[in-house]
A protein has these predicted regions:
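Secreted/periplasmic proteins
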Residues: 2-6, 17-128
Length: 128
């Protein structure tokens, strides 16, 4: 029975490492990644608060939050209904509302849609 334990342990370690995945570490390796879904924008109360990467949120800068894209990634966000687009830099994590794929700064959102709508359908594409 004792000789089987090391064999089972080795098989388990091999299985676990074979099933693991790694995500790209830099924005460039995500280039071409695309996703379609709802975008919203930051409320005014978040002005001058720290983002997940330590920067201060400024509503007049073209920045955004995404759940998994690396910080510093440049992303083209296109409003599906009117074709307008804006390039933003990922510097925060979120959104944490079901169905939303990106949170935009207020100025970025305003450049492609009307803030009174609250959320719009967008396509996002990592450009670098």
């Amino acid at each position: 029975m004792k000789p089987i334990l090391p064999l089972l342990l080795s098989a388990l370690i091999l299985f676990v490492t074979a099933c693991s995945t790694t995500q790209p570490k830099s924005g460039g390796s995500w280039a071409g990644y695309a996703e379609t879904g709802q975008a919203s924008y930051y409320a005014d109360k978040y002005e001058n608060r720290k983002t997940a990467n330590g920067e201060l949120y400024k509503h007049n800068l073209n920045t955004a939050a995404h759940k998994k894209l690396p910080f510093g990634s440049n992303v083209r966000v296109t409003n599906v209904s009117n074709g307008k687009s804006v390039v933003v830099k990922i510097n925060d994590r979120g959104p944490f509302v079901k169905g939303r794929i990106i949170d935009l700064s207020k100025s970025a959102f305003s450049s492609i849609g009307n803030t009174t709508s609250g959320a719009i359908k967008v396509k996002i594409e990592v450009i670098r």
